[in-house]
């Protein structure tokens, strides 16, 4: 009698959804106050002029204006919003 034993179960086959982090508004773009500029973990990019930071390190514009990414010293980056 031909029999087939039960196959073992795989321990793989799961994946979580992405967190949708990253830059949301690039340099040169016009933004409104409250627009999210960057979603990040920790301060990879620091807030500059007219940019606020949320509890989860999200950077957002505090005024209407134009986005500019700048260097802050040798190894840090910051994002600012300047009035147009």
UniProtKB/Swiss-Prot annotation:
Pfam families: Ribosomal_L27. GO terms for molecular function: structural constituent of ribosome. One of its GO terms (cellular component) is cytosolic large ribosomal subunit. The keyword Ribosomal protein applies. InterPro entries: Ribosomal_bL27 (IPR001684). Keywords: Ribonucleoprotein, Ribosomal protein. It comes from the Bacteria. One of its GO terms (biological process) is translation. The keyword Manganese does not apply. Residues 1-25 are annotated as: Disordered. PANTHER family: LARGE RIBOSOMAL SUBUNIT PROTEIN BL27M, RIBOSOMAL PROTEIN L27. Belongs to the bacterial ribosomal protein bL27 family. This is Large ribosomal subunit protein bL27. It comes from Desulfatibacillum aliphaticivorans. The lineage of its organism: Bacteria, Pseudomonadati, Thermodesulfobacteriota, Desulfobacteria, Desulfobacterales.
């Amino acid at each position: 009698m031909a029999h087939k034993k039960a196959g073992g179960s795989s321990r793989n086959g799961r994946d979580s959804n992405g967190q949708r982090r990253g830059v949301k508004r690039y340099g040169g773009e016009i933004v409104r106050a409250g627009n999210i500029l960057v979603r990040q973990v920790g301060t990879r990019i620091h807030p500059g002029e007219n940019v606020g930071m949320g509890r989860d390190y999200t950077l957002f514009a505090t005024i209407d204006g134009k986005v500019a990414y700048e260097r802050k010293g040798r190894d840090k980056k910051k994002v600012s919003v300047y009035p147009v």
